[in-house]
Amino acid sequence: MMPKGLFLALANAADGANHDDFNQWYDDVHAKEVLSLPGVKACTRYKLAGTQMLEGDGAGQQYLAVYEVEVDDWADFQTEMMNAFGEGRLTVNPDVLQMDPVPTTMMFEEVTPRVEA
């Protein structure tokens, strides 16, 4: 069985962009492109809640995409993703996606299996 993990992408809508347009592009175009990559199994998107644990908490980005991934090698996944950008299989739309600063991305390896209440 392949190791499981998460690929996280934190992003903002571009300055002056309509958030509905941003979300439509992200859901209908970008997330589907990422889901087409080998090993990407699912995606759930979130918006930063208005209340945080501590005043001022937040990563600076309003939106989070959580991709569930099963890969043997994270370096291969990163290479595949960069190749997909270079080949146009993964796209960005600077009209709706803030590119300065660029979205924050992180890859996490599973430490323990899912535990439920």
At which residue positions do the language-model features occur?
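Macromolecular interaction modules
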Residues: 1-117
